[in-house]
Design a protein with these regions (language model features):
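Acidic/His- and Gly-rich active-site-bordering loop/insert found
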Residues: 2-102, 111-114, 118-129
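Divalent metal-dependent hydrolysis catalytic cores, especially in the metallo-beta-lactamase
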Residues: 130-136
Length: 136
């Protein structure tokens, strides 16, 4: 896995990551209520051919298997919940849910984790072990 190849693939998914962030930002959900968010993430993972399973109601555990000892693993994690705050930014992607807002960056954490998984999935033959992505 060389830097230039990773950089190229990251650039290739950058618009998708921005779209994911804006979509999630506009549809915030409080802790343990992130059903729409989980469905959206699941659809993105399915489209990319990344294996995953739903866990704990609104969580998702994605899995990218490389080669060699698959017991060797790393877990990348992102929060998916929003806060009970009114958004008054006037942004095009502002919250559509009254009194709930992604005010602490969890929408970006989620989008970046998805982006990382998209890039790593393209390089899975070069990964010695397993990469998990936990959307929580």
């Amino acid at each position: 896995m060389d830097y230039e190849s990773i950089k190229k693939h990251a650039k290739a998914v950058s618009e998708q990551v921005l779209t994911v962030r804006r979509t999630i930002h506009s549809r915030p959900e409080l802790s343990f209520e992130e059903h729409e968010t989980a469905d959206y993430i699941a659809a993105q993972l399915t489209e990319a051919g990344i294996l995953f399973r739903r866990i704990a109601g609104t969580g998702i555990l994605a899995r990218i298997e490389g080669h060699g000892d698959l017991q060797r693993c790393v877990v990348l994690r992102a929060d998916t919940d929003a806060l009970p705050i009114w958004e008054e930014t006037g942004l095009e992607c502002a919250s559509r849910h009254d009194g709930v807002m992604h005010a602490c960056g969890h929408d970006m954490h989620t989008a970046c984790l998805l982006g990382a998984l998209l890039v790593l999935n393209r390089h899975k033959s070069e990964i010695a072990g397993t990469v998990f992505g936990l959307f929580q």
